[in-house]
Amino acid sequence: MTKQAFVALVTCFNEDETINYEATRAQVRRQVAAGNNIMCAGTNGDFTALTHEEKVRLTEEVVDEVAGRARVIVNAGMPATYETLQLAEAFDRIGVDGIAVITPFFIACTQDGLIRHFSTVADAVETPIYLYDIPARTQNHIEPETARKLAAHGNIAGIKDSGGAQQTLEAYLQVAKEMPGFEVYSGPDHLVLWSLQNGAAGCISGLGNALPDVLAGILSAFNAGDIAEAERQQAIYADFRTDLYALGFAPAMVKRSLYLQDSSVGASRQPALLPDKEQDDRIVEILRLYRRL
């Protein structure tokens, strides 16, 4: 099976914090040209700062720009099942390839509550649903046994694991081996190649916003059986990640590194961190080191 890379696409903003849809379309074109698929309205896309209407329009714009040249997954997850369901139904009508559902945040959920939440959404739409686990941000974790139970649902197609723990990723991969049709997509940038070698269907990476060619290079080399080249590209990716993420919150650093390559990306909506000249100077040094400027 050909493995696939998705970029967790940034959302571009104007100076007045309205969405810059044309700049976002430009980022879509850049990623598709590199050979990557798109995930929009996720963690790297400032989804918590977007309104319902903005998420719907953003998805329409992305799908229109992609025009069938790549796959599009969009995140519908919100704290309440009700709002998640409304978004999922809207995305279902637009015609995306998959709907990711991040675990509810702020609200503490039991595993039974998570099963009910995801199943309710999956029952309501025809588009395949992908579970999205990122416990460091949501404080709710999809246990591997819960993933196994949900994998039996006919419209739950897989999981994006952004937990960062290799042990959990291994457990999800075991579920995929036992449940045909259930796919695992790795989120941690340093585990892209490892996850591919151990049965993942692909990855969904935020760092690919800054290094689209390197991300695509890992996947293309792996799919071609050139493991040495895949390892070389993964080493670049992992080193860039280490250098960049040492400066601050990962999605913010990705967005800022992209802004310093292309200012049309804009800053994130407040209360995101304001630009810091000293930090920018350090990011520029990293970008130059990796020949991005």
PLM feature spans:
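Active-site beta->alpha loop and helix N-cap motifs at the rims of alpha/beta catalytic domains
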Residues: T2-H141
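C-terminal alpha-helical cap/extension of soluble enzyme domains
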Residues: Q4-C12, A34-G35, A90, N198-A200, ...
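Short, amphipathic alpha-helical "lid/cap" segments that border enzyme active or binding sites
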Residues: Y21, R25-V28, P144, K277-L287
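A general structural signal for well-ordered alpha-helical segments in protein cores
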Residues: T24, K55, T59, T84, ...
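Alpha-helix C-cap/termination motif
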Residues: A34, E65-R69, I94, A124, ...
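Catalytic alpha/beta core domains of metabolic enzymes, predominantly
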Residues: A124, R137-A238, Y245
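Glycine-rich phosphate-binding "P-loop"
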Residues: D133, N155, R269-Q270
